[in-house]
Amino acid sequence: PAPQTSIELFLIVDHSMYAKYNSNSSKITTTLKARVNIMNAIYSSLNLVITLSGIEMWSAADLITVQSSSRNTLKLFASWRETDLLKRTSNDNAQLLTATNFNGNTVGLAYLKTMCNSKYSVGLIQDHSAIPLLMAVTMAHELGHNLGMNHDGAGCSCATCIMAPVLSSGPAKSFSDCSKHDYQSFLTIHKPQCLLN
């Protein structure tokens, strides 16, 4: 079995999402906590615990330029985390949640094998569904990329697996054997220190 690991996850709510929830910060907080609870259920099979280390809402204005290019937005967010967020608070990974509609059918984006990196341990999430499970799966999927998981391909096809290339609406949500193998390899080769404290 995988060693016990923990991730301190920090969530940023951009201005578009803040407005989408009618500037109701307590409702947003409740919503995000529920999603993280589901993420923990998903990740329990990997013996990994996710702690919500903080939530910051960009209630007045965005602190980066959130744009329809998910790639550009993720790049800006990565730089902002390193130069701003980490100067104020410690976390292992940060996700930016937005109501912005990205180009194409993208609902999330993250760097691969970057967990614990001060700049690139980030993910970008479009608030695309009112269904908590689907949002938790999207967040878990992008976090999976940070943890070294590739999309499920031939040989590990699994329609309702977390790392399927396309989000399925099916209820069964688990990691494929390929994802588990990718994660184990990441732990062994990269030895991400922040997960082991």
Curated annotation (Swiss-Prot):
Binds 1 zinc ion per subunit. Pfam families: Reprolysin. Zn(2+) binds at residues 141, 145, 151. It is an enzyme of class 3 (hydrolase). GO terms for molecular function: calcium ion binding; metalloendopeptidase activity; toxin activity; zinc ion binding. Keywords: Disulfide bond, Glycoprotein, Hemorrhagic toxin, Hemostasis impairing toxin, Hydrolase, Metal-binding, Metalloprotease, Protease, Secreted, Toxin, Zinc. Its cofactor is Zn(2+). The active site is at 142. It is found in: Secreted. InterPro entries: MetalloPept_cat_dom_sf, Peptidase_M12B, Reprolysin_adamalysin. Its main location: secreted. Its EC number is 3.4.24.-. It comes from the Eukaryota. Glycans are attached at residue 24. Expressed by the venom gland. This protein is an alkaline zinc metalloprotease from snake venom that possesses weak hemorrhagic activity. Monomer. Belongs to the venom metalloproteinase (M12B) family. P-I subfamily. This is Snake venom metalloproteinase acutolysin-C. It comes from Deinagkistrodon acutus.
